[in-house]
Amino acid sequence: AIFDRSWYGRVLVERIEGFCSKTEWSRAYREINEFERVLHDDGAIIVKIWLQITKQEQMARFKKREADPMKNWKITEEDWRNRDKWNAYLKAAEDMFVKTSPEFAPWQVIPANFKWYARVKALDTVCKRLGTALGVK
């Protein structure tokens, strides 16, 4: 199964947007680790990937989307509002990496300013992790 964001919303979006209390999002780190431990113990292979772009690259992508009639539906006022919280999201992501990277399910942060590189690196990361977990060389 592939989960996109999934249970990490509590320690990212909900934390930054104030949708939960500090007690709740702080507790979520433990709950996430416990849940992923259950998945791992039941035989799931967990690969966690974060595609990281720079603030400058995000701006370039936003402007490109706005200018393209085939893609401007992808950019909303909420995207611009969230961009203003870049530093808060970056801090929350850094906390998430530190607090939810057990040996059996570490985060892989991939530089993603160049989409082709990010795609190849993500596929390479998945293949290597699966190979290691399945004992394939």
Task: Tell me the role of every PLM-derived stretch.
Residues 7-8, 40:
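Functional cleft and adjacent loop/helix regions within the main domain
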Residues 10, 60, 120:
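Alpha-helical elements of the RecA-like P-loop NTPase motor core of helicases
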Residues 1, 43-47, 106:
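Loop/turn-to-beta-strand initiation segments
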Residues 1-5, 11-13:
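Beta-rich strand-turn-strand
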Residues 8, 53-58, 112-116:
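Short, internal active-site loops enriched in acidic
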Residues 13-31, 39-91, 137:
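A glycine- and Lys/Arg-enriched "phosphate-lid" helix/loop adjacent to the NTP-binding pocket
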Residues 68, 91-137:
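NTP-dependent small-molecule kinase module
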